Amino acid sequence: MILTKLKDFVGISEHDEYEEDYDEEMEFPQSVASQPPAEEVAPPPRISREPLSLNNETSIGTGVRNNVIGMPGINNSVAEVVVVEPHSFDEMPQVIQTLRERKSVVLNLNVMDPEEAQRAVDFVAGGTFAMDGHQERIGESIFLFTPNCVKVSSLAGRSQESNETSSSVSSDNFPTWGYETSRLAQ
């Protein structure tokens, strides 16, 4: 009894009202019922197309678009090596920008003060590391910095990978950037 009252209060009653609605057919307004059935519409005829051929003369104005976007700073010409002989540390951001343009940089620090030259090497080496580039000491106070698209190898055929670090011998008499290893003298 209490359960029945609760069902009635909530609105869950076991009446057959709902079942009656499904047995009746739907009634349409007279305007819809009096219309004759629509004729079947034939699909539009298929137009055969010629295969699309793209060439260098295709322009945007013709309606055909090329979705390939070139990488900034990358061109299909010959790789470029820029030799930089800075006189101060203020020129180092320009070296980083050159590396970002995917150009290799030979950095000759012979004309700089040793302390400022060490700072310059550290700065450019950090930028090169951040870009997954490569660095190599190629002479006394001369360094090669390359972007990650350039593979550096020596005459002996050993390639220098980005995860390898160059072996250096520390000495109190020589700064790290100026000490030449015996393997470079070969």
Curated annotation (Swiss-Prot):
<dbReference type="GO" id="GO:0000917">
    <property type="term" value="P:division septum assembly"/>
</dbReference>
<feature type="compositionally biased region" description="Low complexity">
    <location>
        <begin position="159"/>
        <end position="171"/>
    </location>
</feature>
<feature type="compositionally biased region" description="Acidic residues">
    <location>
        <begin position="16"/>
        <end position="27"/>
    </location>
</feature>
<keyword id="KW-0963">Cytoplasm</keyword>
<comment type="subunit">
    <text>Homodimer. Interacts with FtsZ.</text>
</comment>
<dbReference type="GO" id="GO:0043093">
    <property type="term" value="P:FtsZ-dependent cytokinesis"/>
</dbReference>
<dbReference type="GO" id="GO:0005737">
    <property type="term" value="C:cytoplasm"/>
</dbReference>
<keyword id="KW-0131">Cell cycle</keyword>
<feature type="region of interest" description="Disordered">
    <location>
        <begin position="14"/>
        <end position="59"/>
    </location>
</feature>
<keyword id="KW-0717">Septation</keyword>
<comment type="similarity">
    <text>Belongs to the SepF family.</text>
</comment>
<comment type="function">
    <text>Cell division protein that is part of the divisome complex and is recruited early to the Z-ring. Probably stimulates Z-ring formation, perhaps through the cross-linking of FtsZ protofilaments. Its function overlaps with FtsA.</text>
</comment>
<dbReference type="InterPro" id="IPR007561">
    <property type="entry name" value="Cell_div_SepF/SepF-rel"/>
</dbReference>
<feature type="region of interest" description="Disordered">
    <location>
        <begin position="157"/>
        <end position="186"/>
    </location>
</feature>
<dbReference type="GO" id="GO:0030428">
    <property type="term" value="C:cell septum"/>
</dbReference>
<dbReference type="InterPro" id="IPR023052">
    <property type="entry name" value="Cell_div_SepF"/>
</dbReference>
<protein>
    <recommendedName>
        <fullName>Cell division protein SepF</fullName>
    </recommendedName>
</protein>
<dbReference type="InterPro" id="IPR038594">
    <property type="entry name" value="SepF-like_sf"/>
</dbReference>
<keyword id="KW-0132">Cell division</keyword>
<dbReference type="Pfam" id="PF04472">
    <property type="entry name" value="SepF"/>
</dbReference>
